[in-house]
Amino acid sequence: MLAKRIIPCLDVRDGQVVKGVQFRNHEIIGDIVPLAKRYAEEGADELVFYDITASSDGRVVDKSWVSRVAEVIDIPFCVAGGIKSLEDAAKILSFGADKISINSPALADPTLITRLADRFGVQCIVVGIDTWYDGETGKYHVNQYTGDESRTRVTQWETLDWVQEVQKRGAGEIVLNMMNQDGVRNGYDLEQLKKVREVCHVPLIASGGAGTMEHFLEAFRDADVDGALAASVFHKQIINIGELKAYLATQGVEIRIC
């Protein structure tokens, strides 16, 4: 059995790490490189960096900090933000990133997933999916351009359909960003994760809602996700990664202990 992964997420805007609630009202957390180094030292399995306004601004991720991060950590990291071409991806990978993640650009041009997978291999192509639960219809819908709340829009895709579509096109991993839960720390949306797990045959990463160690356990045990991504509980030092992994190990979760 592959070890489950603990993945801190660093949302980047204007060269700094920020964090919002339900993708809105972002506050500045701190500088990118020191935070990345701290998480690596605490025992994170990998890191994810989202340049959250790159796609909505029509630009590619700011690459200036990617090489600096690569110099100070020795764990894999993934970079996302406005990657719309093979050239964009190649540059980011050349600066030291291990994976690239696409979200809004994949919705705009789904063939991008296949072209990236063919060029770089499925193992380093992650598709992020920003999913919103509509309480009136009882359905999950994919959102686009979520880094800028003034430009966020609901797409034609229902989440389960898009999960299946991106796999057909070559996604090697899926990060499910559950917008309703984002930043509120009341637990992952287990029901949605279970439904996605049924149709997701590549590694699935849960994102949005972690507030306690038990929330991570529930995602691994009840929804069988491969990794759990979180931000505010790590940024605000509510949960220490080393202590979290020790707890998960006592609960029978296969996890890498540093």
Swiss-Prot record:
Any Pfam family: His_biosynth
GO molecular function list: imidazoleglycerol-phosphate synthase activity; lyase activity
UniProt keyword terms in alphabetical order: Amino-acid biosynthesis, Cytoplasm, Histidine biosynthesis, Lyase
Top-level EC class as recorded in UniProt: lyase
Reactions catalysed according to its record: 5-[(5-phospho-1-deoxy-D-ribulos-1-ylimino)methylamino]-1-(5-phospho-beta-D-ribosyl)imidazole-4-carboxamide + L-glutamine = D-erythro-1-(imidazol-4-yl)glycerol 3-phosphate + 5-amino-1-(5-phospho-beta-D-ribosyl)imidazole-4-carboxamide + L-glutamate + H(+)
Gene3D superfamilies: Aldolase class I
GO CC annotation, single: cytoplasm
Pathway: Amino-acid biosynthesis; L-histidine biosynthesis; L-histidine from 5-phospho-alpha-D-ribose 1-diphosphate: step 5/9
Protein's GO biological process: L-histidine biosynthetic process
Annotated active site: 11, 130
Subcellular location: Cytoplasm
EC identifiers of the protein: 4.3.2.10
Described function: IGPS catalyzes the conversion of PRFAR and glutamine to IGP, AICAR and glutamate. The HisF subunit catalyzes the cyclization activity that produces IGP and AICAR from PRFAR using the ammonia provided by the HisH subunit.
Subunit structure: Heterodimer of HisH and HisF.
Similarity section: Belongs to the HisA/HisF family.
Cited PANTHER family: IMIDAZOLE GLYCEROL PHOSPHATE SYNTHASE HISHF, IMIDAZOLE GLYCEROL PHOSPHATE SYNTHASE SUBUNIT HISF/H IGP SYNTHASE SUBUNIT HISF/H
Protein name: Imidazole glycerol phosphate synthase subunit HisF
Source organism: Escherichia coli (strain 55989 / EAEC)
Name of the gene encoding the protein in the UniProt record: hisF
